[in-house]
Design a protein with these regions (language model features):
Chain B
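Short loop/turn segments that connect beta-strands within beta-propeller blades
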Residues: 121, 181-185, 225-229, 269-273, ...
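Residue-level detector of Asp-centered blade-edge/turn motifs that repeat once per structural unit
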Residues: 158-160, 204-205, 248-249, 292-293, ...
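A flexible loop/linker signature enriched in serine peptidases of the S9 family
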Residues: 157, 168-176, 194, 212-221, ...
């Protein structure tokens, strides 16, 4: 079937979201359209026809076809553009993925309608044949989806490789800058002398300012000390944050753990 | 169907696992003792002279404590008098963290003060109050404002309304024992003598003051009622009578007698009756100070070679040594919660005020000397009142914050000012 | 039975006599010279080279009588021992460094120290009173060796 191992590597939220939605939609698709177990394997159903049935519209095939076409097109694009600037094109890839997701959601709706049509069919052989065909199509789709997943991964991996040396170092650098700026404003006068600690969570705007008031997640048990540390956060606005949106995204929500009197040696 | 469900769950879990991401954590260690920037704005309708304006009283009080730094408010137009008048961006630009605004209504019979304490960062009201009093209570109202602001921010009640006692020596061999506000205002003499007065001690119930007088050509102990002015000679035994120390319930006094021998510690009722020797030694034992729980007494003794501070348990009479740093440690006094002791220590040939954490035994020097003496804690334990002798020429009193960072003198005149005592919260 | 009560009463009286409750009133050190000045040999007090020296000086934070002052102390001790009517007061002092109360105790220790030396030479406690003024008469402006003279015991006689 589809390889579970493929799901394990993930690079960023969008790709993960995409992965999740793909699989969920697939599951739903399979759940609703495929009969996993034949209803009555040992009894044949006989339909009594008064006349020879006319050919019903086989619309259910079309969507899959479209999907196929779509995927093939993008697959070509991706393969072409890797040697160039993977960075910029990662954006395009992501945008396309978004479009795919949107299309998938539209497809899901269509699947609902198909299900209703399905129920009309009474002929078992016909349904069997349809099912068989569907299975084949599904496998084909999954295979191509696998390939696409793989190429998406290659693209994103390339992305990552370019930034690799810079990305984690940059993150640490900004974390250190933020830590330094706040630490020099911590007034521990109201925090006694014991080795206490307290935690705040903050949300930041790209300007480095607070989106909202800091949230106390763990109190020092001394409200005056909690308030003094919260003031230190306010005084430190605007916090030094990166301009690069991807890097900023990792820092826009932070958990700050304070030890106003330091820690024991 | 179950096969489907199992696979479904498995897939969802795997997907979620790859989705789950902890937010970044930053550890911030340490900090420094700083002062909270507060804008104490002139109150509307406050027509007083500069020194006695309400905001000036509050500013001086809060700055004395060492926890606050007042932002300059001179030359500001459109002074807000109410929280709704506050332009937060203006005060944020001035780096104010808190602000106090208010209004005063005064007539011949009463003064009414309404005020707000505002959090500038969060743009919200912390507290608002209205105080009414007769016109002569203006300074007291100012101190009450300081007390409440202090309590809201630090979690500890303020002491700005309390009183102090001190001895003033005039040039012509005249000594007075004076009582004044903490900031030195409203001073008056309660004892006048031609002989020295030392070791003043305000009783914990606020009603009396004990002191040592040399008027009988040797040291003797008096207890004086502060409301009536009546004084009683409670100790005039053979030899010296000195170092009175109130028990926490104000019912007893520890004291020092000599009887042709070295100074030794006794305990008696506050009226002078039923005196008992506390302990016997061949050394100097002096300067008793009760622990606030009434279970033990701290004292100075030279049994270790030089003066050090010890503690005796009143139950089993077990004696423990308390000070171990340096060769000269005298004059112990305790915080109301019994956790800290202030005393005088000699370092580098200079006598300095120190504070010791009685649990960790960590010692912090609060002053630089060279001749500091007679430290006593504020009723909230956050400040120490003491005497500074500058090269013997003058001596004055002042307060220092418990972390030693903020010293503020108390202006009560140019003469030799010594031997201070601090009233309790209620008196 | 009666004997027992008498015995108990006697024992009680004995204990009462040994009670450590001090006497409440103390005469001021400068008492009047009651029974006249006979046998006090005032001329000797006023002329003798050693007896005219009334101050013993001490090192910082110290209370032992230094060797150079032993002769003076001994001379006064002999005088007191020889004149049972003489009453002396030893008034201890300290310089202004340090706490008032500790200086009071230090001054006291110095005067007791002088008294102890006198006791060795036969002067009895009943003729000597020790008091202290601590730093209360010291020069509050002294610098360095100027403060030396504040660390002393003054010997005075009630008769003077």
């Amino acid at each position: 079937m589809f390889r579970i191992a493929d799901l394990e590597s993930s690079i960023d939220t969008q790709s993960n979201l995409f992965t999740l939605i793909i699989h969920l939609s697939l599951i739903l698709f399979m759940a609703f359209t495929i009969q996993w177990k034949p209803k009555n394997p040992y009894f044949a159903e006989v339909e009594l026809w008064e006349a020879i049935p006319t050919k019903t519209a086989e619309n259910q095939m079309t969507p899959i076809k479209e999907l196929d076409v779509e995927k093939q097109v993008t697959k070509k694009e991706i393969v072409k553009e890797i040697p160039k600037q993977a960075d910029v094109d990662a954006e395009i890839i992501l945008k396309k993925k978004k479009e795919k997701i949107k299309k998938l959601q539209e497809e899901l709706l269509k699947q609902e309608q198909i299900k209703q049509l399905q129920e009309r069919l009474l002929n078992e052989e016909k349904s069997k044949r349809i099912e068989k065909e569907k299975l084949e199509k599904l496998q084909e789709m999954l295979r191509s989806e696998e390939v696409n997943q793989k190429s998406d991964r290659i693209a994103i991996q390339a992305d990552k490789d370019v930034e690799a040396g810079v990305n984690s170092g940059e993150l640490d650098k900004y974390k250190a800058l933020i830590q330094q700026k706040i630490q020099q404003n911590v007034n521990n006068n109201l925090c006694g002398t014991d080795y206490i600690s307290l935690d705040f969570e903050i949300k930041l705007l790209p300007s480095g300012e607070l989106l909202s008031d800091p949230v106390l997640k763990k109190s020092s048990k001394n409200p005056s000390c909690d308030e003094a540390v919260e003031r230190a956060i306010f005084i430190s606005e605007p916090l030094p944050v990166p301009t690069d949106p991807k890097l900023f995204a990792k820092l826009k929500q932070l958990r700050l753990k304070f030890y106003p009197n330091g820690q024991p040696e | 169907m179950t096969q489907l469900i199992k696979t479904l769950i498995f897939i969802i879990l795997i997907s979620l696992h790859s989705l789950a991401k902890a937010i970044e954590v930053i550890d911030i260690l340490g900090g420094k003792a700083g002062e909270i920037a507060i804008a104490v704005l002139p109150f509307e309708g406050d027509g007083s002279e500069k020194d006695i304006k309400f905001n000036e009283i509050v500013k001086a009080d809060l700055e004395r404590s060492g926890f606050f730094r007042a932002i300059k408010t001179d030359g500001i137009n459109n002074i807000p008098k109410d929280i709704k008048d506050i332009d937060y961006s203006y005060w944020t630009a001035l780096k104010a963290e808190l602000a106090i605004v208010g209004k005063v209504e005064k007539n011949d019979t009463q003064v009414k003060v309404t005020w707000d304490l505002v959090d500038i960062f969060k743009q919200k009201l912390i507290t608002t109050m209205e105080y009414v009093g007769n016109p002569s209570q203006g300074r007291l109202i100012g101190h009450r404002i300081s007390n409440l602001v202090y309590e809201k921010v630090t979690g500890t009640p303020g002491v700005f309304h309390t009183k102090i006692g001190y001895v003033k020596k005039f040039d012509d061999k005249k000594y007075t024992l004076n009582i004044s506000d903490l900031d030195g205002f409203n001073a008056k003499a309660v004892v006048t003598s031609t002989q020295p007065i030392i070791s003043t001690r305000w009783s914990p119930d606020g009603k009396k003051i004990a002191y040592v007088s040399f008027e009988k050509k040797k040291p003797v102990i008096f207890v004086q009622d502060l409301s009536t002015g009546e004084r009683k000679l409670v100790a005039n035994f053979k030899g010296n009578n000195s170092a009175p120390a109130w028990s926490p319930d104000s019912k007893q006094l520890a004291l020092v007698l000599t009887y042709n021998e070295f100074s030794q510690i006794y305990v008696m009722n506050a009226d002078g009756s039923d005196i008992k020797r506390l302990m016997r030694s061949r050394y100097i034992d002096t300067e008793p100070a009760w622990a606030p729980d009434g279970q033990s007494i701290y004292f100075t003794s030279d049994r270790g070679g030089g003066p050090q501070i010890y503690n005796i348990n009143l139950d089993d009479k077990e004696i423990k040594r308390i000070t171990f740093e340096g060769k000269y440690n005298v004059s112990p006094r305790l915080t109301p919660d019994g956790k800290f002791m202030t005393f005088i220590t000699q370092e580098g040939g200079k006598l300095k005020v120190a504070a010791q954490n009685l649990k960790s035994n960590q010692v912090l020097k609060l002053t630089k000397g060279p001749n500091d003496e007679s430290p006593v804690f504020a009723p909230n334990g956050h400040m120490v009142l003491f005497t500074l002798k500058n090269s013997g020429n003058t001596s004055k009193i002042g307060t220092v914050s418990l972390n030693g960072f903020k010293f503020v003198p108390i202006e009560v005149g140019a003469n030799l000012i010594q031997e201070p005592t601090w009233s309790p919260f209620d008196f | 039975m009666k004997k027992k009560i008498l015995l108990t009463a006697l024992v009680a009286l004995l204990f009462a006599g040994c009670s450590s409750t001090p006497i409440n009133d103390a005469p001021a050190p400068s008492a009047a010279a009651g029974s006249g000045n006979e046998g006090l040999d005032l001329d000797l007090l006023r002329s003798d080279s050693l007896l005219t020296q009334r101050s013993i000086y001490f090192d910082f934070n110290k209370y032992e009588v230094k060797a150079e002052y032993q002769d003076i102390v001994n001379a006064h001790a002999k005088y007191i021992a020889d004149h049972p009517n003489a009453k002396a007061t030893l008034k201890g002092h300290a310089d202004y460094h340090g706490s008032h109360e500790y200086n009071l105790a230090l001054g006291q220790k110095r005067s007791v120290s002088v008294k102890d030396v006198m006791n060795l030479k036969g002067a009895s406690d009943s003729q000597i009173e020790t008091v202290s003024f601590g730093e209360e008469e010291a020069n509050q402006n002294c610098q360095g060796s100027q403060c030396d003279k504040d660390r002393r015991v003054d010997i005075s006689y009630d008769v003077e």
